[in-house]
Amino acid sequence: MRIYSNPYELMSETARNIWEMGTEVKPKTYQNKVIEGKDEFITKELICEQYCLTHMDDPSPLFVFTKSKDWADAEFKERISGVMENPGKAWELRKDIWEEFLVNGFFDYTYAERMNETVSYKGKAFSKIGAIIELLKTDNDTRKAILNIYGEDGFNEDCDSNYLGGEHRIPCSMYYDFLIRENARGEKQLNICYHQRSSDFVTHLGNDVYLAWRLMEYVASEVGIKPGYLYHTIDSLHSYKKDWVKLKTSIQTELR
């Protein structure tokens, strides 16, 4: 597993890897849109890309292509708000990406819905993320602190597996897994293991990384423990042909 010490290393080396080692794939769908036969949506793809990010001193390289940190911060607030918001307000800061996916004023799903769904923990009602925080407080060694995003939607009584045909959008994120473990110095820290089925490198990866890191910091703070590392697995990490020129552009140049 590749270990990155900062977001600049992550973004610059991953861009190069996709360009040099990505294999071409011609997908038929993008979210809930049909793109079959559209040349600009041919992808370069890396399968089961895995890495560990150990520090987030400067997040700006994560937004080098999107300039979307304001959206990411607003989106994060909605995700931990305790309210199952749909569509919320954060999407308005990135209308160019999200507006086309509104259906009768709502999205097919939101992370705020999936993360704040009410569940029962030891006989009491909590949001899904709230239950995980309570579990981590009482059992530092647990392997059950999994915040699933993909799967059943208790709010709409839906199941993502019903929409494999593309009728609705389904989450690119599978789950976040929180593990409290000792680091090399013998200090307990809360790590986050983030598994995605799919991530668009140019349009979404930087946001995905930032939001996962913020989530780790938030849960660590609520539990009262030091935040640790992000372990990230992406089954299909890809870039669309319309964005390939950005893979060959120096990120340092883009940051200036």
Identify what each model region corresponds to.
Residues 1-256:
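Terminal, non-catalytic protein-protein interaction segments that mediate quaternary/complex assembly
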